[in-house]
């Protein structure tokens, strides 16, 4: 059991490394783009698919390893079931909270974009005409 736990920990660390590397590479190689617009160049980015495939494979390996853990029989099954139900409820709450935060952040992005547009217009109008 300890070997499986170590293996699981190693796989999770590997997945975290993949995600960190993906973010770093994509951040370093992503071309500049306008607010609110997605360019064709970004949609055609080949690294996205490569990193997504690596992360998906790591997630599948973790899932397979977790499924291989033995389930203890007896009264603990009911406890595990109860804990899973509670965790599902907590997860739903967190998802709802996250959805709210995403909505708030999208609203704030809109405000920032409007302010940037105002700043740009002000700067353009304050320049002397040639």
From Swiss-Prot:
Protein name: Mediator of RNA polymerase II transcription subunit 21
Gene3D superfamilies noted in UniProt: Mediator complex, subunit Med21
Gene name, Swiss-Prot/TrEMBL: mdt-21
Source species of the chain: Caenorhabditis elegans
Intracellular or extracellular location(s): Nucleus
Signal peptide region: none
Cysteine disulfide partners in this protein: none
InterPro entries: Med7/Med21-like, Mediator_Med21
GO biological process, one term: regulation of transcription by RNA polymerase II
Domain of life from the UniProt record: Eukaryota
GO-annotated cellular components: mediator complex
């Amino acid at each position: 059991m300890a070997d499986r736990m170590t293996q699981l920990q190693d796989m999770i660390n590997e997945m975290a490394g993949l995600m960190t590397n993906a973010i770093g590479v994509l951040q370093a190689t992503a071309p500049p783009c306008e607010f609110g617009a997605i360019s064709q160049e970004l949609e055609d980015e080949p690294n996205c698919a490569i990193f997504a495939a690596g992360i998906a494979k790591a997630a599948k390996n973790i899932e397979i390893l977790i499924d291989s853990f033995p389930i203890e029989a007896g009264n603990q099954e009911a406890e595990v079931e109860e804990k899973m139900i509670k965790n599902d409820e907590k997860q739903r709450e967190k998802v709802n909270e996250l959805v709210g935060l995403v909505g708030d952040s999208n609203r704030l992005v809109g405000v920032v974009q409007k302010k940037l547009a105002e700043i740009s217009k002000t700067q353009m109008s304050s320049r002397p005409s040639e």
